[in-house]
């Protein structure tokens, strides 16, 4: 498993905190832990960024994960014990995405997570050289969050 670090830069221009997590990247797939620290704990209930070979429109796959109640929060959803998220993924397109570091060819994935407490979604934009460069989330409370690449160091 590769480790990666991400830093959070609000409009103020300085990092408020950073975090390290993991990525599995091999000839079959790329899978990464979502941002799940502090304000981003809600993303544990969303589909994880994940793309699987073959990279072609219409490719579908599934998996599931148990999620303990230590991820609950009164601000979005509470439950007792463990829930099971069932994930469905599909490559729905390929497009040129304009980012802050240039235009990138991206595979577009659409995914959902469904459990006893509700459903969430993710549209992921995956560039074969740089990985996931944009993530559009619909959260369990129906709020939306977009995470985009800003720079590569």
Q: What does each of the following model-derived ranges do?
A:
Residues 1, 6-8, 70-153:
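Acidic, serine/threonine-rich low-complexity disordered tracts
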